[in-house]
Amino acid sequence: MGISKKSQLVPLLAFITMFLMVVSRVSSSIADANSLHFSFSQFSQNPKDLILQGDATTDSDGNLQLTRVSSDGSPQGSSVGRALFYAPVHIWEKSAVVASFDATFTFLIKSPDRDPADGITFFIANTDTSIPSGSGGRLLGLFPDANIIKNSTNLDFNAAYNADTIVAVELDSYPNTDIGDPSYPHIGIDIKSIRSKSTARWNMQTGKVGTAHISYNSVAKRLSAVVSYSGTSSTTVSYDVDLNNVLPEWVRVGLSATTGLYKETNTILSWSFTSKLKTNQLQDLRIASVV
């Protein structure tokens, strides 16, 4: 007795359906594993999901104070502080494009000085990053002091290199022309160096809440930043860079700030971040086929 074509198609269709379900499930789980999102509308006084370094603290008003302030909220000089999200970010993978990401934070800078200093950064660094020695003031808590690197006979060169493996967007309130700063407050993009690759004049407004938005387009390989205050025009800066060639595969994201002889409050009111590493579809199919 012959077997109908319809009866032959049933098991084939069932197999195809099951295969597509496996592919979909595997692809979805990989995408989830390579995504990260967090959002702080305020900061608790004992944040378990932040790594606080140096003088960084959270206060009773739900703010993140990156640099030291007195009991009455006045800024203190010679202070360095950083805050990093506890979970690492998968920024690139051999079988994938580099992750795209968006970060936004709101901030408040206040100063009794005519010239506030020194600034705030959003940065990406090694997962084990710590505040480098001598990185206060103009170095924004990110890079070791050049004199320490050149002159120390006890230098751990691997540690020095790792400390420099940083990508950052700086909101630089005090121009240090001796390290390549323009002669005015500016927004800059730093690639493994405190000497910014690209800058734009920043009309900084003390005592007003500002918003910084940083994004990376992994297709265009463009890092961009927009800083604005309500009711004013924004400052925009961008630079083309392949993060695959600059950063390790796994990183942490953070905020840093410093003060020096001159001082300012470096208060963070909110902070959010989203990253997405899109895997190669053919790689997903190969993984699914062996499940």
From Swiss-Prot:
One Pfam family of this chain: Lectin_legB
Entry similarity comment: Belongs to the leguminous lectin family.
Residues involved in Mn(2+) binding: 170, 172, 181, 186
pH dependence of this protein's activity: Optimum pH for hemagglutinating activity is 8. Activity drops with more acidic and basic pH and is lost at pH 5 and pH 8, respectively.
Binding site for Ca(2+): 118, 172, 174, 176, 181, 208
Naturally occurring in which organism (per UniProt): Dioclea lasiophylla
Alphabetical UniProt keywords: Calcium, Hemagglutinin, Lectin, Manganese, Mannose-binding, Metal-binding, Signal, Toxin
Listed name of the protein: Lectin
Prosegment location in residue numbers: 147-162, 281-291
Other remarks in the entry: Binds one manganese (or another transition metal) ion and one calcium ion. The metal ions are essential for the saccharide-binding and cell-agglutinating activities.
Temperature optimum or stability note: Hemagglutinating activity is stable after incubation at 70 degrees Celsius for 1 hour but lost at higher temperatures.
Signal peptide residue numbers: 1-28
InterPro entries cross-referenced by the UniProt entry: ConA-like_dom_sf, L-lectin, Lectin_LegA_CS, Lectin_legB_Mn/Ca_BS, Legume_lectin_dom, Leguminous_Lectin
Record lineage: Eukaryota, Viridiplantae, Streptophyta, Embryophyta, Tracheophyta
GO molecular function, one term: toxin activity
Residues engaged in binding a carbohydrate: 138, 174, 228
PTM summary: The mature chain consists of residues 163-280 followed by residues 29-147. Concanavalin A-like lectins of the Diocleinae subtribe undergo proteolytic processing referred to as circular permutation. The propeptide is split into an N-terminal and a C-terminal part, the gamma and beta chain, respectively. These are then religated in beta-gamma order to form the mature alpha chain. The beta and gamma chains can often be detected in cell extracts.
Role: D-mannose-binding lectin that also binds alpha-methyl-D-mannoside with even higher affinity. Has hemagglutinating activity against rabbit erythrocytes. Shows toxicity against the brine shrimp A.nauplii. Induces reversible paw edema and hypernociceptivity in rats.
SUPFAM superfamilies (alphabetical): Concanavalin A-like lectins/glucanases
Stored PROSITE patterns: LECTIN_LEGUME_ALPHA (PS00308), LECTIN_LEGUME_BETA (PS00307)
Residues the record marks as site: Cleavage: 147-148, 162-163, 280-281
